[in-house]
Amino acid sequence: MSLHQINNTQVPGRLHGKVAIITGSTLGIGAAIARLFVHQGARVVLNSHNHDTAAECVSSELGPEHSLFVQADVADASAMRALVDQAIAKFGKVDVLVNNAGMNVFSDPLQMTDEEWQRCFSVDLEGAWNTTRAVLPFMLEQAAGSIINIASVHGHKIIPGCFPYPVAKHALIGLTRSLGIEYAARGIRVNSISPGLILTEAIQSWFASCPDPVAEQQRQAALLPCRRIGEPDEVAYTAVFLASDEARFINATDILIDGGRSQLYHD
């Protein structure tokens, strides 16, 4: 059965009974995570800074019994507190938080504007902290919770011309490890996932903007040891595992999903 077809008659899934907040969840990796979470029995709070066609499509697909869409900018701490309050009001608890919302800021360090620097960190780092800080009191009260930060291979390896995005993603992995240790004894797990090149709508748009889209996609695939580009569902399955009780002894850990690219010294 397709992951995009929600079948309510199935036996309980790996996330049966859990409630998850997933930021940036109307497209790409976030939408794939939301769909798979519901497929595995969770109820989800969808989020984007825009209430657009993509948001309406995912909300309609998952249905009001299984999902709630809240428009909010993760850079706005008060908006994220309100989002968590709405999640509690709708579903009664929050078991899982997936901090997926992010943005690419790729620039030359000396040509980058102050606004670009601030926006990159306000979304890619502070956005995760704003939502985490809002949800932590509820997780601590129930002495259980799984927080999953979607970082990046850029948090491990540096590509010239991508500043300051790798700085923010390195910091996000540091935040993951620090909070994971800080709250481990109180039932909270904090882990991160670092995707490499994943065939999201944004990447497809980037390929389309290239002079020869097919050649560029083939070139990018050839850089990977597995000779193919990753799919959003492949990230989503790892998020399901980390959200589930199967991962109860995994904490303060980052998982790379890049087809082995980051481990390749030379090709």
Stretch-by-stretch model annotation:
Residues 137, 181-185, 248:
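Alpha-helical segment proximal to the catalytic Tyr-Lys
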Residues 132, 168, 176:
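Active-site helix of classical SDR
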Residues 19, 26-27:
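Conserved glycine-rich cofactor-binding loop
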Residues 129, 228-257, 262-263:
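C-terminal substrate-recognition "lid" of short-chain dehydrogenase/reductases
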Residues 108-109, 113-121, 220:
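Substrate-binding pocket helix/loop in short-chain dehydrogenase/reductase
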Residues 2-12, 157, 240, 251-267:
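Short C-terminal tail/terminal secondary-structure segment
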Residues 152:
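Residue(s) in the substrate-gating loop at a strand-loop-helix junction
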